[in-house]
Structure formats: structure tokens, C-alpha cells
Amino acid sequence: MINLEDILDMCPLTREEVAAIGEHEHVEGVAAATLADYLMHLRKGPQEVNRMICEDIRAALHRDDVEHARKLFAALKHFMATHPEAARGSE
């Protein structure tokens, strides 16, 4: 039987990136991984993931959770390094 770890292993994003999408959309586990995979296959999906993680960082900073914002920033930095098509304005 396929479990969450198997699904995360098939996803093109890291666990931290999937968690950020899940945080943004208020879903966890399989739902977050499925959404992440779906977004990465859309034409502007990587840019949407970029936007979601940026919004999560802003939300963490607004509630003074600097440590969480730091972790999200690290996830964003890795995401942008591995998915340059996610940059705003890229086609």
C-alpha cells in the first residue's frame, strides 16, 4: 500500500516546500503533497508555489514568528534554486 512517505518521494518538491503549501492552503499530508504535485504541472504553477511560500513568510512575520519565517525562507531559497521557472515574470 502507498503511504505518505511514498507520495512525498514522488513529489517534485521537498517536504518543507510541501509543508509550506499545506500551511497556506490549510491541508496536511496527502492532500498537501497532491496539491503540490498538481501545481508543479500547471503552466504557471511554480509561480503560484512561489507566491504561496512568500505569503506564508509574510504571515509568520506578522505574528512575530521569526524562526518559522526563517525556515520558510530556507524552503523558498531552495525552491527558487531548483525551480527557476518560478521566478515572477518568467515564461
Could you say what each language-model-derived stretch is?
Residues 1-52, 71-91:
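Long, non-catalytic architectural segments outside compact domain cores
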